[in-house]
Curated annotation (Swiss-Prot):
In NdvA the ATP-binding domain (NBD) and the transmembrane domain (TMD) are fused. Its EC number is 7.5.2.3. It comes from Rhizobium meliloti (strain 1021) (Ensifer meliloti). Homodimer. Residues 21-301 form the ABC transmembrane type-1 domain. This is Beta-(1-->2)glucan export ATP-binding/permease protein NdvA. SUPFAM superfamilies: ABC transporter transmembrane region (SSF90123), P-loop containing nucleoside triphosphate hydrolases (SSF52540). The chain crosses the membrane at residues 22-42, 55-75, 136-156, 158-178, 245-265, 269-289.
Length: 585
């Protein structure tokens, strides 16, 4: 993207406040006009003093300009600050909502820390651009547009010096930006690396401590920061050189105005006041050009940060719901997969040609080795991923035609890692249903065999569980997650390795809760512990993304196939059981 495209898109985010921005634009035009008028008025005051005329009216006018300029600048700055701060907060909220809605595959490929870093840096960068646009950029642009024609109207010869000065600034900035474009992009890449390393180390601090990695991780961070500085220093050197060249051009221009102005005054071709006005113009131009250079530098540095954010925004908008998406209502729970295929990007993993039908209220167990596609299958059901081919129907309705929100309202999931947030136990359970009363939360906890350990804690349901629930044991976390699913009371239930983190005693306590939860619900169970799938109405054995075997638990256990072999390997089924079943057959 060009600098202009980056800047234009950054300003588009202000369109939601177009009337407030419009008022600030008008105020900036007025302020710019006053800025141009001041040197002219000052020159006329000098001429009046030289000719011993009455200067009181002009001094009062000059003072009035000064007072008005000060008050107007304060008001513009105040409104600009409020608008920029408010828009930054709303953009952060909007972008957060869109990013969180992206599929897990997107987050896995991009990296959580990368998306977070991109969002935060972009919001701060946009905030700076908005603020400077409303405070300085616009006023500077208007002042420059008014200054040049006003100067030419007064004297063409001195005006040409101002034009040459402006051209010198533009050429110097253009050369420096072309020389440092790749370097600045590299700097931004190094910032992402540093942020990712810090985020990764802190989020895995227990591993860092356990394996004595503190010094090693610190050394690694130092190495990344050194690479960042190695990329940053050449960019800074170029901009330092540009500042020096601009300063030389400014000094030469000022000297030229003084020398030529003196000669013209001595010849009687120009008044002293006009030379003073041009000196004021030159100072004004130098100041405004310095602001424009700073503005160009700001946009140049912002481009690397914002291009990544704009790409992120575009990828998120591509996933927005179609306008004609319907609502999934009154779900009974009949689920059908019709020839579903899906592949992860840059990977051979996925699912291929999966077809089956589950009646309402049935329990479907999905088993198979790691990487077989079990979790992918239930993620497709929840539209975490979109299938490349085929249809998934709930009660005969293609889920691709309904909103994700209404679809997921009909599905409750208990994850393998519980998925608790750093909030209170009560708030984590209420994720199932935000408007639930405390009595309903407590009833759900009781049904999940979680009320005992919750009430034993000092703050009870107000106990904050820590990041990812690290202040609770694995079994406690899982029971809170089950309580959350109970509270949601959805017609379709997904248990993704829901009991894998539990010991035998706790699993026995939770089994009753899960059995109660499964009642009258279509339930999908993903499990490595095959003992948990005995009561399944339908068992789907998957391998390498394909359905290898499908049938009832007893049917498959007696078929001497892959599922039966897995049962024998886990000790649930013995060779004697197989012989008996074959004899009975």
């Amino acid at each position: 993207m060009s600098l202009f495209q980056v800047y234009a898109r950054a300003l588009q985010y202000l369109a939601v406040h177009k009337f407030r921005v419009g008022a600030i634009v008008i105020a900036n035009i007025v302020l710019a006009a006053i800025t141009i008028a001041e040197p002219i008025l000052f020159g006329r005051i000098i001429d009046a003093i030289s000719s011993q005329k009455d200067v009181a009216p002009m001094l009062l006018l000059w003072a009035g300009f000064g007072v008005f300029n000060t008050i107007a600048f304060v008001l513009v700055s105040r409104e600009a600050d409020r608008l920029a701060h408010g828009r930054r907060a709303s953009l952060l909220t909007e972008a957060f909502g869109r990013i969180v809605s992206m599929p897990l595959s997107w987050h896995s490929q991009r990296g959580t820390s990368n998306a977070l870093h991109t969002l935060l840096r972009a919001c701060e960068t946009l905030f700076g651009l908005w603020l400077e646009f409303m405070r300085q950029h616009l006023a500077t642009a208007v002042a420059l547009m008014l200054l040049i024609p006003t100067a030419f109207a007064m004297d063409v010869r001195l005006s040409l010096i101002l034009v040459v000065l402006g051209a010198a600034y533009v050429m110097i900035s253009k050369v420096v930006m072309s020389r440092t474009k790749e370097g600045q992009a590299a700097v931004e890449g190094h910032y992402h690396t540093v942020f990712s390393h810090v985020s990764d180390s802190i989020s895995n601090v227990s591993v860092v401590h356990s394996y004595n990695r503190i010094e090693a991780e610190t050394r690694e961070l130092k190495k990344f920061t050194q690479r960042l500085l190695s990329a940053q220093y050449p960019v800074l050197d170029w901009w330092a050189l540009a500042s020096g060249l601009n300063r030389i051009a400014s000094t030469i221009s000022m000297m030229a105005i003084l020398v030529i102005g003196t000669v013209l005054v001595q010849r009687g071709e120009l008044g002293v006041g006009e030379v003073i006005a041009f000196i004021g113009f030159a100072n004004l131009l130098i100041g405004r050009l310095d602001q424009m250079k700073a503005f160009a530098t700001q946009i140049f540095e912002a481009r690397a940060k914002l291009e990544d954010f704009f790409q992120l925004e575009d990828s998120v908008q591509d996933r927005e719901e179609p306008a004609d998406a319907g609502e999934l209502k009154g779900v009974v729970g009949e689920v059908e997969f019709r020839d579903i295929s899906f592949d992860f990007a840059n990977s051979a993993q996925g699912v291929r040609n999966v077809s089956f039908k589950a009646k309402a209220g049935q329990t479907i167990a999905i088993v198979g080795p790691t990487g077989a596609g079990k979790t992918t299958l239930v993620n497709l059901l929840q539209r975490v991923h979109e299938p490349k081919h085929g249809q998934i129907l709930i009660d005969g309705v293609d889920i691709a035609t309904v909103t994700r929100k209404s679809l997921r309202r009909s599905i409750a999931t208990v994850f393998q890692d519980a998925g608790l947030m750093n909030r209170s136990i009560g708030e984590n359970i209420r994720l199932g249903r935000e408007d639930a009363s405390l009595d309903e939360v407590m009833a759900a906890a009781e049904a999940a065999a979680a009320s005992d350990f919750i009430e034993d804690r000092l703050n009870g349901y107000d106990t904050v569980v820590g990041e990812r629930g690290n202040r609770l044991s694995g079994g406690e976390r899982q029971r809170v997650a089950i309580a959350r699913a109970i509270l949601k009371n959805a017609p379709i239930l997904v248990l993704d390795e829901a009991t894998s983190a539990l010991d035998v005693e706790t699993e026995a306590r939770v089994k009753d809760a899960i059995d109660a939860l499964r009642k009258d619900r279509t339930t999908f169970i993903i499990a490595h512990r095959l003992s948990t799938v005995r009561e399944a109405d339908l068992v789907i054995f998957m391998d390498q993304g394909r359905v290898v075997e499908m049938g009832g638990f007893h049917e498959l256990s007696q078929s001497n196939g892959r599922f039966a072999a897995l049962l024998r390997a886990s000790g649930i089924l013995t060779d004697e059981d197989v012989r008996k079943s074959l004899t009975a057959a």
